[in-house]
Curated annotation (Swiss-Prot):
Belongs to the RbsD / FucU family. RbsD subfamily. GO terms for molecular function: D-ribose pyranase activity; intramolecular lyase activity; monosaccharide binding. Gene3D superfamilies: RbsD-like domain. InterPro entries: D-ribose_pyranase (IPR023064), RbsD-like_sf (IPR023750), RbsD_FucU (IPR007721). This is D-ribose pyranase. It comes from Shewanella halifaxensis (strain HAW-EB4). Substrate binds at residues 28, 106, 128-130. Homodecamer. Disulfide bonds: none annotated. Catalyzes the interconversion of beta-pyran and beta-furan forms of D-ribose.
Length: 139
């Protein structure tokens, strides 16, 4: 059994096979997921698992270098947006790296998921609680 925080087999495999600049989305329960993109569906019920809990595990398991968010996220769901920024800031401090943060329209965000290696669906029911992480390198 894996003694690290990430126990999901599909997510572990994804982390192990990511390359530099590959993108992975973590989304709320309602984001449309393109049929051609790998879906890792963690959603059990409304709010379980949460978006932030899933982000925390992802950041502990995978090196990132960039973040893409929908512009609408900060306006419509400011508490969840701020919680995400806190996690990103903590990861920057822990790694000594600075990540780019890009804001795009929600429509552009949905289109960008077509290029993701995978979309990880949570049970989150907060509007626009979605993020795309661009993979970095550990060296």
């Amino acid at each position: 059994m894996n003694k690290h925080a990430l126990l999901n087999a599909d997510m572990n495999y994804l982390v192990a096979t990511l390359g530099h600049t590959d993108e992975v989305a973590i989304c709320d329960a309602g984001l449309p997921i393109p049929a051609a993109v790998q879906r890792i569906d963690l959603a059990l019920t409304h709010g379980v698992p949460s978006f932030i809990a899933t982000v925390k595990i992802w950041l502990a398991s995978s090196q990132i270098e960039g973040v893409v968010l929908a512009q609408e996220f900060a306006d419509v769901s400011p508490e969840c947006h701020q919680a995400l920024l806190v996690e990103i800031e903590a990861e920057q401090l822990a790694t000594g790296r600075t990540f780019s943060i890009e804001y795009v329209s929600h429509e552009a965000f949905k289109q960008r998921t077509h290029n993701s290696r995978a979309v990880i669906r949570t049970g989150e029911c907060t509007p626009y609680a979605n993020v795309i992480f661009k993979t970095g390198v550990v060296f």
